[in-house]
Every structure is written in C-alpha cells, then in structure tokens.
Amino acid sequence: MSRYRGPRVRIIRRLGTLPGLTNKIPQLKSSSINQSTSNKKISQYRIRLEEKQKLRFHYGITERQLLNYVRIARKAKGSTGEVLLQLLEMRLDNIIFRLGMAPTIPGARQLVNHRHILVNDCIVNIPSYRCKPQDFITIKNQRKSEAIISKNIEFYQNSKIPNHLTYSSLEKKGLVNQILDRESIGLKINELLVVEYYSRQA
C-alpha cells in the first residue's frame, strides 16, 4: 500500500488529532451522528485497525514499512510496542518535525528529500534514516535552506521540544540526547493494539 496523499482533514475526522500529518484540529461531529455511532458495537478488529492507521498516517509511512518496523521490534529486547514507537520516533523526518524545523512530518520529509538537512555534517536525503543518541542535525549552509527552516522554527518553537531532543537557535542545531521514553511520544496511541493487529503477520 502506497503512502497516503489524499485530503488530510478527512483522516483526522475519522481518527482524531494527528500532529505529524497536519496541524489542523478535527471538527467535532454533530451529536446525532455521535449518538448513532455510540449505539453501534465496535468490533475489536476495528479498534486495532484504527490504532494501526493512526500510526501509519501520523508518521506518514506505508503499510509495508509499518509491518517491517513491527518485525524489527519483535526481535528486539523489551516491550514490542515501546520499541516500535522508538523506531518510528527516531526516524530522521520525525526528529526534524519534533525539533520544530518543519510544521508536519510530510514537510520534514520534503526538507530531507531536497537535501536541506545534514546529520553529523553529512547530507542525508533518506527520511527513514534512523537517528541515534549524540547525532546532531543541522541545515545546509545555503540561504534558501536557512530561510525555509528559520521560518518554521520561529513559528513552531512555541511547542515543547521533548526531553530526548535539544535545539540551539543560536547554532541552528538539533541534538538527539538519548532514546526517548514512552512519555515523550507526541501522539495519543495504544501501541499494544497495533502489535495485536499484526500478531498473525509479523
């Protein structure tokens, strides 16, 4: 399944707020619709499916990519769900988003694809690149690159940067301090339901 490129508002109306996908807030449905929905029995499969879709759309990845991350998480030590979130959060496109260098993850992915971003002084144009502790992220020393990211930083630095990251506005440099903990996830998600969804596939 390819990456979603359709209307983002339609997705957040169905799944709720997904800050990685869009900074728009979904409008509440009418009470009559809510009432009819609440009267229906929602299957466990649908609940797991929706949690899985939240991860897919928030991080902007394909079905195959998410399944591969689940398989990697299963082989790692620790809680599969927590390791899965760590793998997704340490993607370069997500790190750029969480640092406030881009308004959304698709926006961050575009910066990476267009070679605006350096990791440890080397250009990286792979959005799925897995960052690690002590990696530092900087902007390519070109006027266009700096103008794009400075505008984003000025607008989005009001939002709190998670504890596992640091951004220096003076040096225009982001630092990955450590692997993040569960409390630093910027998404309301039950990752165990996602693991259960893939239990027969991974």
From Swiss-Prot:
<dbReference type="GO" id="GO:0019843">
    <property type="term" value="F:rRNA binding"/>
</dbReference>
<comment type="function">
    <text>One of the primary rRNA binding proteins, it binds directly to 16S rRNA where it nucleates assembly of the body of the 30S subunit.</text>
</comment>
<comment type="subunit">
    <text>Part of the 30S ribosomal subunit. Contacts protein S5. The interaction surface between S4 and S5 is involved in control of translational fidelity.</text>
</comment>
<dbReference type="GO" id="GO:0009507">
    <property type="term" value="C:chloroplast"/>
</dbReference>
<comment type="function">
    <text>With S5 and S12 plays an important role in translational accuracy.</text>
</comment>
<keyword id="KW-0687">Ribonucleoprotein</keyword>
<dbReference type="GO" id="GO:0042274">
    <property type="term" value="P:ribosomal small subunit biogenesis"/>
</dbReference>
<keyword id="KW-0689">Ribosomal protein</keyword>
<keyword id="KW-0150">Chloroplast</keyword>
<dbReference type="InterPro" id="IPR022801">
    <property type="entry name" value="Ribosomal_uS4"/>
</dbReference>
<comment type="similarity">
    <text>Belongs to the universal ribosomal protein uS4 family.</text>
</comment>
<dbReference type="InterPro" id="IPR036986">
    <property type="entry name" value="S4_RNA-bd_sf"/>
</dbReference>
<dbReference type="Pfam" id="PF01479">
    <property type="entry name" value="S4"/>
</dbReference>
<dbReference type="GO" id="GO:0006412">
    <property type="term" value="P:translation"/>
</dbReference>
<dbReference type="InterPro" id="IPR018079">
    <property type="entry name" value="Ribosomal_uS4_CS"/>
</dbReference>
<protein>
    <recommendedName>
        <fullName>Small ribosomal subunit protein uS4c</fullName>
    </recommendedName>
</protein>
<keyword id="KW-0699">rRNA-binding</keyword>
<dbReference type="GO" id="GO:0003735">
    <property type="term" value="F:structural constituent of ribosome"/>
</dbReference>
<dbReference type="InterPro" id="IPR002942">
    <property type="entry name" value="S4_RNA-bd"/>
</dbReference>
<keyword id="KW-0694">RNA-binding</keyword>
<keyword id="KW-0934">Plastid</keyword>
<dbReference type="GO" id="GO:0015935">
    <property type="term" value="C:small ribosomal subunit"/>
</dbReference>
<dbReference type="Pfam" id="PF00163">
    <property type="entry name" value="Ribosomal_S4"/>
</dbReference>
<dbReference type="InterPro" id="IPR005709">
    <property type="entry name" value="Ribosomal_uS4_bac-type"/>
</dbReference>
<dbReference type="InterPro" id="IPR001912">
    <property type="entry name" value="Ribosomal_uS4_N"/>
</dbReference>
<feature type="domain" description="S4 RNA-binding">
    <location>
        <begin position="90"/>
        <end position="153"/>
    </location>
</feature>
